[in-house]
């Protein structure tokens, strides 16, 4: 059984390869440091069970973010105060051997679930992501993310869209 877990020492970070060296290096060298410093949290998808070193199928990281509402669409901005909070999906990657098997969607749905946990405690207007390129942008758009007017590679998924998506997946 597959499980989403908070990144821990028991996870095999060194064996992870998604094909993108910056993402590999983040997981291997930076993710746990960011967690210790309170910068972000990284979650991994692993096969369940009690093994010594759990291979990582994929991961995502989340951090808090704040932005000016004017960076959103005019329709969204008019309903909000000047400064708004959300959650940033900092990174999302799938190990090469698991790519094109729906793992990215599994990770994204898990990130949405984590967003809702935070939303229920502290609020937030949605999930933000900086797509690394046009291909990544199109991937996120499949799930309802929309580009911000100020930067087409910065995308936003409103809380109501997340709630609807999770209701359909349950």
Give the ranges of each region predicted by the language model.
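Non-catalytic substrate-recognition and accessory regions of acyl/acetyltransferase enzymes
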Residues: 1-101, 105-170
């Amino acid at each position: 059984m597959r499980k989403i877990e908070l990144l821990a020492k028991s996870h095999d970070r060194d064996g992870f390869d998604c094909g993108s060296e910056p993402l590999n290096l983040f997981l291997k060298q930076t993710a746990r440091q960011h967690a210790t410093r309170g910068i972000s949290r990284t979650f991994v998808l692993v096969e369940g069970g009690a093994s010594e070193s759990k291979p990582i199928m994929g991961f995502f990281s989340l951090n808090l973010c704040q932005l000016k509402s004017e960076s959103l669409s005019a329709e969204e901005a008019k309903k909000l105060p000047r400064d708004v909070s959300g959650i940033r999906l900092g990174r999302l990657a799938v190990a090469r051997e698991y790519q094109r098997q729906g793992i990215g969607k599994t990770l994204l749905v898990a990130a949405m679930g984590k967003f809702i946990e935070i939303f229920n405690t502290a609020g937030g207007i949605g999930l933000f992501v900086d797509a690394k390129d046009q291909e990544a942008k199109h991937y996120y758009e499949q799930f309802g993310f929309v580009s911000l007017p100020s930067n087409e590679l910065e995308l936003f998924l409103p809380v109501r869209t997340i709630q609807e998506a999770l209701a359909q997946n349950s």
